[in-house]
Regions:
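Bacterial N-terminal signal peptides that target proteins for export
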Residues: 1-7
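Bacterial N-terminal signal peptides
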Residues: 8-16
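Sec/Tat signal peptide C-region and signal peptidase I cleavage site
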Residues: 18-22
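Active-site neighborhoods and metal-handling regions in enzymes and metal-associated proteins
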Residues: 23-485
Length: 485
């Protein structure tokens, strides 16, 4: 097997340059959609062109927007993307990797879907098949997706000279706070449309920050208390009393996918299995460590395995480790393939994968799907564990399985088929075309090795899509264990 060594500093520089090159080759619909935040819209995804992303946005406006607004009986949806949540000029150190996220200007849940980092966007259901789409204040990347786009107020930035002139010329029109400039004229706009129920992006029961796909870029819960006060004043008492939380509407909009998104979801992975298999420099047993080969974790384990303690432990013949989705076994002298007890783990993995794919159904809640999968696992002689940790007290002949399937690619983890997370994650019903991270962990005991010794495999976010047939894969799943000679 051909092997290559790359030292950590070179690796970092390579991926930095690769990211910059990919961004120039595949321009995004909005700067700053990173693989750390929106996994379906990676800058390295060859399908994620601006034209494709704009097409998806318009398709969702046509198909998903009327559906979710009417399901929630919302006549008008006012979504305020606050311009002060993130600064485009700040350098942030995330995960101790010295990553520069200065292009990420907003953590609003719908910043991609609406194509804006700062705006007041209003959708009105006036009957018919189409929802009126208005950018009342702010800027968007795709103005053609909207019916009306009013220019951004020059008074959002308090450092502009125009604000000084405006205050002098209109002393009685100046709002009490600069936050009020965004809503000037909105009361008249709403009055002309006379909505009965107005959905606004503030939270009452859900925490989008808690439900975020990555904690380093947690989604916001919506407008602030001050925003609510200024918006209420702009609408007047009559329409302010008609405001309700749009939190469930937002969640439904995020979880409903159109076909174009499924194309991107598959295209944003690593491609074929051959393309995902690592090529390693010759491993020297007793010298080369897991860190040297950029491995993720050891698969051959004691019952009380501590992965952090093993990162610098030299690899030995007969060890199995995982890098990305792929498991690797280091052959012992004289072996031409892994022994049967090692190969058996893959039979168990495939069995778990099939049970999952056949028992996630459109319309079930995450909790219902979890129970269904657990029942099937136990029916196949496996043991379910509610945390990713080998349980030495269970039957030593039973393979133990932990589950944490959840939505990926939209920034939020719900719906979630897992014992983890807030309750609303698993209360959420599973919609058609849900983009699902198929994440499960298999701990298979090997009694002949000794008590508690086992083989571990983690399916980390295999890309699944929920259809009428169950879970289907947007990318071919891993097919087996790779041998290292």
């Amino acid at each position: 097997m051909k092997k290559v060594t790359i030292f950590p500093v070179i690796i970092y520089m390579f991926f930095l340059l690769w990211e910059l090159d990919a961004q120039s080759e595949y321009p995004e619909a909005m700067v700053g959609i990173s693989h750390a935040y929106y996994t379906s819209f990676d800058s390295d995804n060859p399908f994620a062109t601006k034209e494709m992303l704009d097409h998806i946005r318009r398709e969702k406006f046509d198909l998903v927007l009327p559906l979710v607004m009417r399901e929630h009986k919302i006549d008008m949806w006012i979504h305020v993307i606050r311009p002060w949540t993130w600064s485009g000029n700040e350098f942030r150190k995330l995960e101790h990797m010295n990553l520069n996220y200065r292009s990420i200007d907003s953590s609003d849940p719908l910043r991609y879907e609406f194509g804006s980092n700062a705006a007041v966007i209003v959708f009105t259901d006036q009957g018919g098949d189409r929802i009126e789409r208005v950018v009342f204040e702010g800027e968007v990347n795709d103005p053609g997706a909207f019916d009306i786009v009013r220019r951004q107020s020059p008074f959002i930035n308090q450092e502009n000279y125009e604000i000084m002139d405006y205050v002098k010329e209109n002393p009685y029109k100046v709002p009490a706070s600069e936050m009020g400039y965004r809503f000037m004229g909105l009361g008249k706009f709403v009055l002309e449309r006379d909505p009965k129920r107005i959905g606004v992006n503030y939270a009452e029961t859900l925490s989008f920050a808690e439900g975020s796909e990555t904690y380093t870029l947690a989604l916001t819960d919506g407008i602030s208390y001050a925003d609510h006060l200024h918006l209420s004043k702009a609408l007047g008492d009559k329409y302010a009393r008609r405001m309700v939380s749009a939190e469930h509407l937002i969640l439904d909009y995020l979880t409903r996918s159109v076909l174009g998104e499924i194309v991107l979801f598959g295209g944003s992975g690593r491609g074929s299995e051959e393309g995902r298999i690592q090529q390693f420099d010759p491993i020297v047993p007793g010298v080369t460590t897991l860190m040297d080969v950029e491995g993720g974790w050891y698969c051959t384990r004691e019952w009380d395995h501590d992965e952090e303690a093993f990162s610098s432990v030299p690899l030995r013949r007969g060890d199995m480790f995982q890098s990305g989705q792929i498991p690797y076994y280091i052959l012992k002298d004289g072996e031409v393939k892994p022994p049967q007890e090692v190969l058996r783990i893959w039979d168990e993995v495939v069995k778990v994968r099939k049970i999952i794919s056949r028992n996630v159904r459109v319309g079930d809640t995450g909790r219902e799907a979890l129970k269904q999968i657990i029942d099937k696992l136990e029916g196949e002689g496996m043991a379910y564990i509610d945390r990713d940790r080998y349980d030495v007290t269970l039957d030593p002949k039973k393979t133990q399985v932990h589950l944490d399937l959840h939505q990926v690619g939209k920034g939020v983890l719900a719906p979630r088929i897992s014992p983890m997370g807030p309750r609303w994650h698993s209360d959420k019903k599973i919609p058609l075309l849900l983009t699902l991270g198929v994440e499960y962990m298999v701990h298979m005991p090997v009694p002949k090795w000794g008590k508690g010794k086992h083989i571990y495999y983690c399916s980390l976010h295999e890309r699944g899509v929920v259809t009428e047939r169950g879970v289907e894969f947007a990318l071919p799943p891993v097919s087996g264990i790779q041998s290292i000679r």
